[in-house]
Amino acid sequence: MFTFLKIILWLFSLALASAININDITFSNLEITPLTANKQPDQGWTATFDFSIADASSIREGDEFTLSMPHVYRIKLLNSSQTATISLADGTEAFKCYVSQQAAYLYENTTFTCTAQNDLSSYNTIDGSITFSLNFSDGGSSYEYELENAKFFKSGPMLVKLGNQMSDVVNFDPAAFTENVFHSGRSTGYGSFESYHLGMYCPNGYFLGGTEKIDYDSSNNNVDLDCSSVQVYSSNDFNDWWFPQSYNDTNADVTCFGSNLWITLDEKLYDGEMLWVNALQSLPANVNTIDHALEFQYTCLDTIANTTYATQFSTTREFIVYQGRNLGTASAKSSFISTTTTDLTSINTSAYSTGSISTVETGNRTTSEVISHVVTTSTKLSPTATTSLTIAQTSIYSTDSNITVGTDIHTTSEVISDVETISRETASTVVAAPTSTTGWTGAMNTYISQFTSSSFATINSTPIISSSAVFETSDASIVNVHTENITNTAAVPSEEPTFVNATRNSLNSFCSSKQPSSPSSYTSSPLVSSLSVSKTLLSTSFTPSVPTSNTYIKTKNTGYFEHTALTTSSVGLNSFSETAVSSQGTKIDTFLVSSLIAYPSSASGSQLSGIQQNFTSTSLMISTYEGKASIFFSAELGSIIFLLLSYLLF
């Protein structure tokens, strides 16, 4: 049993020792602004600042960083638990922050601590912003640190530091003493309220004696007066907010009971001395106002008029405890390796950065940031045919996103710049359909087509697609032709359209019984009696990082057979166009199909009287915006391609 307890204690000690301070953190950009129109140090203020952790790779759960702030009376957060959580955009709780020490009237410094709620070692850096409410300690008692701070603060512009890394110039207003009594009060953070009253004022002379009665709970809010905390002294040395910088003892008779304090002083106070009282009261939960009722009766000697006069008055002072504010935002950059395997035996390894941002609690603050991403992808596809296609692509683009998190409206605009380099070696697949004869006894030419497509164009320094083609056939009447058309377009600024035009040459061949003497008429065989079909499928697949553009094709087909993306000498012209329009996407599969389909004449037993070879010029136009462009085939040809590719791959 003793050994078991030793193990428990050892594990507990180990857990405490494993939590380390995060020292590689910097604080900057401090802004201190007033919460109210009253710009005195002991009133409410808002502090906002940035923090940055340059190397987050060693941060584990339980690690923490602390900001120590002298001259700060207390920090006040929004919720009742007095904690603030800073989360990332993916929902990960990065830090939970709390006030580990309120200086109040007890300590020299107020400390603010943030503890890591999760293992954050997967992030390279963490940057964020923190906002909370505070008030400064500028005196009001005989407590050691409050008395020191009464001498520190001055009215007017003043450089105020929070910690040892950041500071801000704050313009403090002085306090006016226009009545017979001056009041001040603030909550301590320890379930109590500290109040200060200054009175027994005798202008043009000195104080002869009198009484002062204070009810610290005139509204019956169950506020208890801490009689042991009562301080009754005199002073004529005050700072700009009428708090004593030094004080003198008195022989006052002090009676404390319940929420009441009675003070009787039968001695003279010279040279502008006045009587001040400091006391602590309990602060019940959910109590936001505290009312003090004061009664004064005292006698003064006017040395100028050489007269003695009595002053008697009563007043009520209401203290309102303001609600605290806090706001926390954070962004992180992560680095990790991901591996993906597809049915094409493709392995993609990418090292890249992701960015996130979030807004926690309440407040209204906008944070703009730029996150740079670098992506490198290397893909090697196992060859399945003899025709090679090499595609090199480099793309640079930017995207925008807005995120709003928390109870207040908080928008963070994020600009992400991505640089991606893709190098691929892809093989094509050739599928040859068997030759068959139906309803035709004459001579027949069999066409076997092989199509090689490679392409290159430039959009904003981004290589994309143009075309070339090689056609081979056993028919000596058709000449082997290699056509290559490349169009380059220089980079243009973002949000300006870029147009890339490429020309694809195609062959439409017709089997007909057209007579040479009558070029304007011909007859054709029924489409149902096809002779042969030879198809070549070239499939290239790549994954660019840019959003894609959809391409749709308008084509005019003849009634006989059609060669798509093939070239030869021809006597006629026909055309179809492809137009690219902007759309969103992250992957594009490009399929090019060439087909040769022969149909016989309707005359039984006749020979093909001639071949009409129809040259088709294909115009491809790609419209890009903000540097985003790629190709995706759709419409009728796209549907055929998709079915063919699905059949081959699956």
Swiss-Prot record:
Known outcome of mutating L294S: Decreases secreted alpha-agglutinin activity by more than 20-fold
Ranges: Sequence repeats: 339-378, 384-423
Region spans: Ig-like fold domain important for alpha-agglutinin activity, contributing to a functional binding site for a-agglutinin: 216-322
Family matches, as InterPro entries: Adhesion_dom_sf (IPR008966), Agglutinin-like_N (IPR024672), Agglutinin-like_N_N2 (IPR043063), ALS (IPR033504), Fibrogen-bd_dom1 (IPR011252)
Family: To C.albicans ALS1.
Glycosylation site residues: 79, 109, 135, 248, 282, 289, 299, 303, 306-308, 311, 314-316, 329, 331, 334-335, 338-342, 345-346, 349-350, 364, 402, 485, 501, 614
Disulfide bonds, paired cysteine numbers: C97-C114, C202-C300
Effect seen on changing G324A: Little effect on secreted alpha-agglutinin activity
Protein name: Alpha-agglutinin
Signal peptide: 1-19
Organism: Saccharomyces cerevisiae (strain ATCC 204508 / S288c)
Induction per the UniProt record: By exposition to pheromone (A-factor) secreted by the opposite mating type cells (type A).
Membrane protein topology class: Lipid-anchor; GPI-anchor
Cross-referenced PANTHER family: AGGLUTININ-LIKE PROTEIN 6, ALPHA-AGGLUTININ
Record function comment: Cell surface glycoprotein promoting cell-cell contact to facilitate mating. S.cerevisiae A and alpha cells express the complementary cell surface glycoproteins A-agglutinin and alpha-, respectively, which interact with one another to promote cellular aggregation during mating.
Record's subunit section: Interacts with AGA2.
Residues at the site labelled Not glycosylated: N348
Phenotype for T289A: Decreases secreted alpha-agglutinin activity by less than 2-fold
Stretch list, region 2 X 40 AA tandem repeats: 339-423
Consequence recorded when altering E295 to A/Q: Decreases secreted alpha-agglutinin activity by 2-fold
Subcellular location: Secreted, Cell wall; Membrane
A Gene Ontology molecular function term of the record: cell adhesion molecule binding
Mutagenesis or variant effect for I290M: Decreases secreted alpha-agglutinin activity by less than 2-fold
